[in-house]
Structure formats: C-alpha cells, structure tokens
C-alpha cells in the first residue's frame, strides 16, 4: 500500500476540511453528513477505530445503503486487509459524496461518474452498493487509483459551487 505517512497526511487534510464544513452547517440533522462523520475517530495519536452506525441511525437511504455494502457485505475483507487509515479514506469518500452534491443528484457526482466509468457500470443504475463495493474491491488496493481518488475528493470538497446546496 501507500506509505502510511503520505496516506495519513492526505487524510488529515481532508478530515480537517470536513470538520470545517460541518461546523458551518445550520441544520445538520437534515443531511447525513453528521452520520458519516462520527464513523471517524481522531485523537492525538492519529486515527483510531471506525464507529459504524446501524442503518436505522443513518437518516438517508443513500448513505445507509452505502454503509451496508461497504461495512456489511465487505466487512470480512476490510477486517482482514484494511488498516484504520485505509478505512478512514473510505469514510472520507462517503463524506465527500455527501458534501459535494444534493443526494437526489448523486448521479452527477464526478467521483461517482469516475467510478462508474472505471468499472463500466450502467450510468442509470440504482445499485449504489455496486459502486462502493467496486471501490473497496478494486480501486482502494491500487496505489495509483487511490492517489487519484484522493486528489479528486480534495478537489470536490474544496469546490464552493458544488457545496452551495448546503447553505
């Protein structure tokens, strides 16, 4: 995998941005951003464990389905192959999806389109879990793809126009 220090530096940068945007929200309970954020634990020693909310705790079907498919169907693979830092990247990916567009317009997300193009998935598919499953299975374990995805995520999060629906 990637050098852990490089990976954590990238993740910390994204994490700090996510915290900043969360603090700017007036009505966080209206979106699933907070549900996504509390799966990420951070302390002075760095990233520790990931708390995974149950589907019932997630106030959005899109987000809940993504949790189910990443941490449910792929839990065995994650437990055996992923370090905490890698799981944080997955968490930040979900947060990035929620930050960048209205959930109803998810199909227009650059990252989702990128993943679908990468795996040649039907653009009109409603099988959200397949997208995230492919992310875990095929993209996360390729160093070049992971770096590319981190860069895309950082670009999306920093794009003020794409976050305008939150205001």
Model-derived segments and spans:
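Active-site hotspot residues in diverse enzymes, especially metal/ion-binding acidic/histidine motifs
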Residues: 1-167
């Amino acid at each position: 995998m990637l050098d852990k220090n490089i990976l954590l530096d990238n993740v910390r940068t994204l994490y700090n941005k996510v915290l900043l945007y969360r603090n700017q929200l007036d009505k966080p309970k209206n979106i699933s951003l907070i549900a996504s954020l509390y799966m990420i634990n951070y302390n002075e020693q760095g990233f520790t464990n990931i708390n995974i909310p149950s589907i019932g705790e997630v106030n959005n079907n899109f987000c809940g389905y993504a949790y189910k498919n990443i941490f449910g169907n792929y839990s065995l693979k994650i437990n055996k192959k992923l370090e905490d830092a890698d799981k944080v990247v997955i968490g930040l990916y979900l947060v990035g999806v929620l930050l960048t567009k209205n959930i109803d317009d998810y199909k227009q997300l650059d990252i989702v389109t990128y993943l679908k193009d990468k795996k040649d998935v039907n653009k009109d598919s409603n099988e959200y879990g397949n997208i995230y499953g492919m992310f875990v299975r095929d993209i996360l374990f390729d160093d070049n793809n992971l770096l590319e995805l981190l860069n895309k995520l950082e670009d999306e999060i920093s794009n003020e126009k794409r976050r305008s629906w939150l205001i």
